[in-house]
Amino acid sequence: MKKIEAIIKPFKLDEVKEALQDVGVQGLSVVEVKGFGRQKGHTELYRGAEYVVDFLPKVKIEVVLADDHVDAAIEAIIGAAKTDKIGDGKIFVSPVEQAIRIRTGESGDDA
């Protein structure tokens, strides 16, 4: 099993969720996060004063999948989240040793 963590622009969340559902993903977790990458921050003007915004709002999606579903999920995320502009986000894939469904005690791919 693998865990996919995708950091995306918030307005792309619905499109990414639908794209993942289309490739068979049955569940995911979403967390609102702030961060910066190469794009750094930006300046905003508010009531005549200029402010530097260092951390930009993003959304982190977490999905745990069987190994044979990972490539399709990654392609779905990229296809739905890509705007061809700086700040589109990143995808991280890491191994998951074990998953257990609390209610039933099922483990592995059944969890």
Where are these predicted regions, by residue range?
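Positively charged, small/polar-rich N-terminal and surface patches that mediate targeting and assembly
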Residues: 1-111
